């Protein structure tokens, strides 16, 4: 091989490496960095409220911006209300940016009532032009002495793990967390490891989301919602540590 050919190959390889490095850096820059957010006020640079639509299927309510509010106690409150007979409005808050591997923590109290769910999770999906990847911390209002962990990778779930807490989560604030890494997800309650997953781990960065909603057609999972309103769940702070 001549010197000129070798030189051209070296330049091509170097150019490809630089292009890939630039792409990787760009992809990394598109995800959010570490933050700690106490809910003393609503930070529109970090969060956005779902408003005016329903997820349909098992979600038996319409997301309303008014159902995401801040209290004088330094809390974010997500509410489930009824504007008219058998119609329900619910609350969902989500991050503006997407976030990747790292430690996700929330200090919160779920709502307590049969047929409802209080969630903290990461999500991305087809409407974002990505696979459906999701990592969940969920409280089923029918029994808030337990927490459910779950995750989806390219739409494949069925990884549910229900953990007995030893206390009623609806009565006081506790910290729930998951540490998402390329080869594992570890879930924590008040700093204590409760569950680890190591297979089919999600790879796609997603938005940080939190919501309160009532279900329909999933009575075996949630119990039959009895129409009680208003209901609310509270969040004191959220923290993300990129790593």
UniProtKB/Swiss-Prot annotation:
Tell me the gene name. bg1
- Pfam families annotated for this entry? Glyco_hydro_16
Positions of the catalytic residues: 134 (nucleophile), 138 (proton donor)
The EC code for this enzyme is: 3.2.1.73
SUPFAM superfamilies under this entry?
A: Concanavalin A-like lectins/glucanases
Catalyzes what? Hydrolysis of (1->4)-beta-D-glucosidic linkages in beta-D-glucans containing (1->3)- and (1->4)-bonds
What does the record list as coiled-coil region(s)?
none
Organism listed in the record: Bacillus licheniformis
Q: Which domain of life is it from?
A: Bacteria
Please identify the protein, giving its name as recorded. Answer: Beta-glucanase
**Annotated family:** Belongs to the glycosyl hydrolase 16 family.
Alphabetic keyword roster: Disulfide bond, Glycosidase, Hydrolase, Signal
The record lists the effect of residue 105 to Q as:
50% of wild-type activity
The signal peptide annotation in the UniProt record is: 1-27
């Amino acid at each position: 091989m001549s010197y000129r050919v070798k030189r051209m190959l070296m330049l091509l390889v170097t150019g490809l490496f630089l292009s890939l490095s630039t792409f990787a850096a760009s992809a990394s820059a598109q995800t959010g960095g570490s933050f700690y957010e106490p809910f003393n006020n609503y930070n529109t640079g970090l969060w956005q409220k779902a408003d005016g639509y329903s997820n349909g299927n098992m979600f038996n309510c319409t997301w309303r911006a008014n159902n995401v509010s801040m209290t004088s106690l330094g809390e974010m409150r997500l509410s489930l209300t009824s504007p008219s007979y058998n119609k329900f409005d619910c609350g969902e808050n989500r991050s503006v940016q997407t976030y990747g591997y790292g430690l996700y923590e929330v200090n919160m109290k779920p709502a307590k009532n049969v047929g409802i769910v209080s969630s903290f999770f990461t999500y991305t999906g087809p409407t974002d032009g990505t696979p459906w990847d999701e990592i969940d911390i969920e409280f089923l209002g029918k029994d808030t002495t337990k927490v459910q962990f779950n995750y989806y990778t390219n739409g494949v779930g069925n990884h549910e793990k229900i953990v007995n807490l030893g206390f009623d989560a609806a009565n006081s604030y506790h910290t729930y967390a998951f540490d998402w890494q390329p080869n594992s997800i570890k879930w924590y309650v008040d700093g204590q490891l409760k569950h680890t997953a190591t297979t089919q781990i999600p790879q796609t960065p997603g938005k940080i989301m939190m919501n309160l909603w009532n279900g329909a057609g999933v009575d075996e999972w949630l119990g039959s919602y009895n129409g009680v309103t208003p209901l609310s769940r509270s969040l004191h702070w959220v923290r993300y540590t990129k790593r």
